[in-house]
Amino acid sequence: MMSKLGVLLTICLLLFPLSVLPLDGDQLADQPARHAQSAERNARFHPVKRCCPFPMCYQVPHCPCCG
């Protein structure tokens, strides 16, 4: 009886490993906004025009003046 229970437990752990359980928010995929680069935080961003100078704009994601 105990060996059958051990085999069943082993099979269950192989089919459903503990690593697939979600952790407590320490994964980067759970917090995409915190790790995204903002155009306002970029040194090339012009606060009055609300965009970047044209030659530099291609490197800034989601820049309002370049699309």
From Swiss-Prot:
Expressed by the venom duct. It comes from the Eukaryota. GO terms for molecular function: ion channel inhibitor activity; toxin activity. Keywords: Amidation, Cleavage on pair of basic residues, Disulfide bond, Secreted, Signal, Toxin. Disulfide bonds join 51-65, 52-63, 57-66. One of its GO terms (cellular component) is extracellular region. Residues 23-50 form a propeptide. InterPro entries: Conotoxin. Residues 1-22 form the signal peptide. It is found in: Secreted. Coiled coil: none annotated. The modification Cysteine amide is found at residue 66. The cysteine framework is III (CC-C-C-CC). Classified in the M-1 branch, since 1 residue stands between the fourth and the fifth cysteine residues. Belongs to the conotoxin M superfamily. This is Conotoxin reg3.8. It comes from Conus regius (Crown cone). The lineage of its organism: Eukaryota, Metazoa, Spiralia, Lophotrochozoa, Mollusca.
